[in-house]
Each structure stands twice: as C-alpha cells, then as structure tokens.
Amino acid sequence: MGGSFLQSWLNKALSWPGWYKWYWWLTSTKSLSIGRLVCVEALFWSLSFYVVVLLSVAYLTLFERKVLAASQVRKGPEMVGWLGIMQPFADGIKLFSKEYFTPSNSNPALFFLGPCFMLLHSFILWGCSPGIWGCGVYFFWGGLYVLSVLSVGVYGVVLCGWSSNSRYAMFGAVRALAQVISYEVMLVFLYLCPFFVVGSLDLESVSLSQVSGCNGGVLFLVLPWWVFCVLAESNRAPFDFVEGESELVSGFNVEYGSGGFAMIFIAEYSNILFLSTLTSVLFLGGGNLLGNGEYFGLISSSVIGSFFSFMVVFLIVLCRSSFPRYRYDMLMKLIWCQILPILMSCFALFLMII
C-alpha cells in the first residue's frame, strides 16, 4: 500500500459520504440555534483540550530524551530549534510523511485499526480529566469510569500483535496480556483505597479530602506500591517486557512504521501522562492541595496540579535511566507469590481500620 500514512488516512476519512453534512450543520449561519452554539462551543473546547494533551505528549518525549542524555553525560537532541525545542514536531512530520506499509501476511483492516484503537483509548481516558488544573471535568462516577476504561487498554496491544502475523509481535502481545492481567489485580486494590477512605467514587472528593491532611498520611503509604504498579501497567522500565529489544526486536509494534508507529507512541506516552496526573489527584491532592480553586484561582491550581504530575513523570523517567530491565519470570513470580498475598492481607486490615 503506497502513499504516506497521512494521505491514506485523509482519503479514508473524506470518502465517508456524510462528513460534509455535519460540516455544513456546524458552520451554517442560517437559523443558528442555542443547541448548535452549545455543540460548537463543546467541540471547540474539546479540541483545544486534546491539542494541549498532544503538545504535552510531544514535549514529554523531549523531556525524557534530555533526562536520559543527562544521566549518560551527553547533550541529547539540540539541533532542531533552540535547544532542540522543535525536535518533537520534526519527528512527527518525519513519521507521518513516510510511506504507509502493510505486511503481506497481515490482516490489513485490523492492522490499521490497532493503533487507532490505542490512540482512541488514550483520548477516552482523558474524558474524565482528573484534576490536571484543579477544575477538571469531574462527575460522581469518575473513579469507576477511569477504572473501566483502563482495563480495556490491553486490547489495542493484543490487536496490534495478532494482526501483524509476526511471531515477535505475537509474543510481545501475549506478554502484555499476561503482565497487565497480573498487575491489574494489584492496581484495583491500590486504586480503591482512596475511594474507601473518602466514601465516594468522585475524583474531586478524593482530591479535596487531602486538603486537611487527615487522609494524606494513610494514602501516602500506598503511594510507593502504586508507582510500582504504574510502571508495570504502562510497560515502562524496568518492566518494559512488551518491547524487549534484546528478545523480541521491538515487541508487538515490530511491523509498524510511519504513522502507525507514531500513533502507538503517542498513545503510550499519553497514558503515562494520564497515570501521572491520576497519581497526583489520588495521592498528592492534585490542584486542590492548597484548597479549592475558588480561593486560590485557576492559575495557581493549574501550576500546583501540573507540578505534581511533572514530578511523577520525572520519577518514571528516572526509573528508566537508573534500573536495568527485570527478568520476566521473576516479575510474574514477584506479583503472584510475594506482593499479592501481602497486599491482600494489608487491604483486608485497611478495610477493618476504616
């Protein structure tokens, strides 16, 4: 399949016969109703929010490369723009302008839908917007929403690995499935602790409950285990067995290039950013640490929430530069034989205390 990935995707999108009707309905000025204005405004703010997320993901990659370069006593990317500030955009243009190639033995439709599913899943995760600015889009069942969406993320990895019809990709997908199932049990136990303490599934209630500091001490004890679980769930070093280069060449995405690889890359780093933000809300107070945003203002809440998210991201990147890759069988033995029995006992004791 020739042509660039971007051109191929645009051709498929524009071939849909009904797209221009929606465009006319949104942009027409005849009989402009309040409902249409609300739809246009919601669409504008949603697109603006996701543009901010994409920009954050782009500069997260640059930040990681700079930290890894500093840990290895080298300069890192600095050729494109001032101090390499335009490097993420150069990488994105390079990837999306390359030829979109489909392996001959693969399933073309599922091969294309795999990265799309991963990117869509990462965007749906941000639908709850858990307090990155202290005034996110909260709702009462936000905690259950995040847990439900997080649990289906592995399907994109399995879809990419299976549709590639490659042994390396399939082994990476099977590893991802086993690892996520194993550590999702631990994730659920740790994730529910803040909600049991507060007595609500609202993320804002969890964030505001830590303002007084009465719950912060209890939840802070859970934080190291949670960070450990986040590293395993997001396939980050030292638990990046899904993309084990020394064993699986590149894991489940070995057959992907151009825009497909870029979409997988964006989805993975978007999930890292989301989990960092979720960590700051559940265990560090997020943007509400100094009180409600109405007292300190939106800007101060934004700075505080972003600072805590940045610190968690920095810790994740620092783990990659500091620790070697763990062994896969030892990782499985660690969770099932050591961590999970201790964690279940502590969780039962925690429920009796509260």
UniProtKB/Swiss-Prot annotation:
It is found in: Mitochondrion inner membrane. It holds the Pfam family NADHdh. It catalyses: a ubiquinone + NADH + 5 H(+)(in) = a ubiquinol + NAD(+) + 4 H(+)(out). This is NADH-ubiquinone oxidoreductase chain 1. Disulfide bonds: none annotated. Its main location: mitochondrion. Belongs to the complex I subunit 1 family. Core subunit of the mitochondrial membrane respiratory chain NADH dehydrogenase (Complex I) that is believed to belong to the minimal assembly required for catalysis. Complex I functions in the transfer of electrons from NADH to the respiratory chain. The immediate electron acceptor for the enzyme is believed to be ubiquinone. The chain crosses the membrane at residues 43-63, 108-128, 139-159, 180-200, 211-231, 264-284, 298-318, 334-354. It is a multi-pass membrane protein. It is an enzyme of class 7 (translocase). PANTHER family: NADH DEHYDROGENASE SUBUNIT 1 (PTHR11432), NADH-UBIQUINONE OXIDOREDUCTASE CHAIN 1 (PTHR11432:SF3). GO terms for molecular function: NADH dehydrogenase (ubiquinone) activity. Its EC number is 7.1.1.2. InterPro entries: NADH_UbQ_OxRdtase_su1/FPO, NADH_UbQ_OxRdtase_su1_CS. The keyword Electron transport applies.
